[in-house]
A protein has these predicted regions:
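Glycine-rich phosphate/pyrophosphate-binding loop at beta-loop-alpha junctions
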Residues: 1-46, 87-88, 92-93, 97-116
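Active-site-adjacent helical/loop segments in soluble small-molecule enzymes
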Residues: 37-94
Length: 116
């Protein structure tokens, strides 16, 4: 979860949907609040075992690594999965890990901020 917008993560920790401030993040797909009654809240609470706080630089670095190695674009929300994997590299060593990279919806300005 981006540190700049950790509304879902903080809500999960509290066991209820919170209305807290969210700052801008490259991960616009995970940004913002969680609507009351949203089905995603219960699904996340029931299925997510571990969460990771990510700095904007970690997300952008992970996105750049993916773009360089895979020669494909990805959006910031997908970059959080790679950033979390990199951050937990030692902890996950020797384990089978799968992540889903979907979404290439990134603005030119956001892309520039990643590759510059």
């Amino acid at each position: 979860s981006p540190e700049n917008s950790a509304v879902m993560l903080r809500s999960m920790e509290a066991g209820k949907i919170l209305n807290i401030e969210s700052k801008p993040t490259i991960s616009d797909g995970t940004a913002g609040g969680v609507e009351k009654g949203a089905i995603t809240f219960d699904i996340c609470c029931d299925t997510i075992d571990q969460t990771v706080f990510l700095k904007e630089a970690e997300i952008k670095d992970a996105m750049l690594l993916y773009i360089k190695n895979e020669r494909k674009l990805l959006e910031g929300a997908a970059g959080t999965a790679i950033a979390a994997l990199i951050k937990k590299k030692k902890e996950l060593a020797g384990k089978k890990v799968g992540i889903i990279i979907c979404g290439g919806n990134i603005s030119i300005d956001d892309l520039k901020s990643v590759i510059v």
